Design a protein with these regions (language model features):
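Conserved glycosyltransferase catalytic-site signature
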Residues: 47, 67-72
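Catalytic donor-sugar/metal-binding loop of nucleotide-sugar-dependent glycosyltransferases
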Residues: 65, 74-92
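Loop-to-transmembrane boundary segments
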Residues: 128-150
Length: 239
């Protein structure tokens, strides 16, 4: 899936987030699933999922104890050696129409991702599993995802600030140039894949890359909000 359905209606920051989320969806939902490595982070998306009903019932259907049932189900599949096979047909989804809604949506996802140890214990306790090690690797990947989500922007900004304090402007330029190159490659690959698989004609521009870079720098605002607010009731999200 990708998140450009309402792209033209969004402000520039949210356009950047639509690219950021599309980058993530294409990498973890498509590319990592095709590579089929237990060491890579993969996930399922409930509203685009095709699964045998008997298998789903054996797994206890969609879990509602944790806020994001897709993450829970994805880990259950790993615990039972059920391969996640991506469909080469993409769904074009909407990006939240306001920054507030996007933050709340991301906080819901992050809360479940960060509860990887609770999910592990819940699955082991309540369901039959066939491969604990594979499930443990899946939970570790959720930990890596949560750590990267909240930590990458912080490390990036601290690296730039540290180099500025030391007046090492060459390092500052190298960090910024490397980061922009990373965003540029990610965005171009994502747009190209979308155009091929969904027969679209999206264009990549410097403006798109710039706002995708801005969105990535502040992409941890949802996780930070989740930690600070520590909500006990799930936010109602747009998707």
């Amino acid at each position: 899936s990708y998140c450009l359905k309402n792209y033209k209606e969004l402000n520039n920051i949210l356009k950047g987030f639509s690219i950021y989320q599309s980058n993530f969806e294409m990498k973890t939902g498509l590319i990592n699933s095709i590579l089929n490595s237990k060491l890579l982070y993969t996930h399922v998306v409930g509203h685009g999922l095709i699964i045998n009903m008997k298998t789903l019932n054996e797994l206890g259907n969609f879990n509602t104890k944790f806020w994001c049932e897709d993450i829970y189900l994805g880990l259950q599949l790993k615990f039972n050696n059920i391969k996640i096979t991506p469909l080469l047909t993409l769904e074009n989804m909407e990006t939240p129409s306001s920054l507030e809604n996007l933050i709340k949506q991301n906080s819901v996802w992050f809360k479940t991702t960060s509860q990887f140890s609770k999910i592990y214990k819940d699955i082991i306790k309540n369901y039959k599993v066939t491969n604990k090690l594979n499930g443990l690797i899946g939970c570790f990947n959720e930990f890596r995802c949560a750590l990267n989500w909240i930590g990458f922007p912080i490390i990036l900004l601290l690296s730039i600030i540290g180099a500025l304090i030391l007046k090492n402007y060459l390092i500052v330029l190298l960090i910024i140039a490397s980061y922009l190159l990373y965003i540029c490659i990610n965005t171009k690959m994502t747009i190209k894949l979308i155009n091929i698989l969904d027969e679209q004609d999206y264009k990549t521009s410097l403006k798109i890359i710039f706002f995708a870079a801005i969105a990535t720098v502040i992409s941890n605002i949802g996780p930070i909000y989740s930690i600070i607010s520590n909500k006990k009731v799930k936010h109602k999200t747009e998707r």
